[in-house]
Amino acid sequence: MNKFFEFNLNVELGEVFNECTAYQISIEYLNKALDISNNLPINKYRLVKAYELRGKSKMFLNDGQKKINGQDWDLYWKARKLNYWEAIYDFSKAIEIDPKDSFLYFWRGFAYESLEEYPNAVKDLKIAKDLDPSFTLTTSILDHIESKGF
């Protein structure tokens, strides 16, 4: 199969499974796409899309988990934190490629906020707001963080 076609197919499948909330499957397809991209001159916007989707999938991976008790709770939160740090890595890679995309800064700021890394969250969310002043959700999250004293 043509490697460009294979890259795009894996990104598309990753997006479909992300939208269906099948985040683990989405991550698997996006991992394949990003592995293929290492040796190809891929369109930067498609590459950004792959990193952004993988970051979102990692953030939401364990969101719907039920029946957490006792020791499982600690493991759950450790896994969640790791997912958020991995998502931050993906958003950072995407920002390196396209530093003018306000949504990438928003998602990375949102991940930092979830980890209570408020200075980093505020920094990214302010950049997102500067890039797109009409993105009101950014303002809402900034107000929420500032109400906590940051």
What are these regions (language model features)?
Residues 1-150:
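Alpha-helical tetratricopeptide repeat
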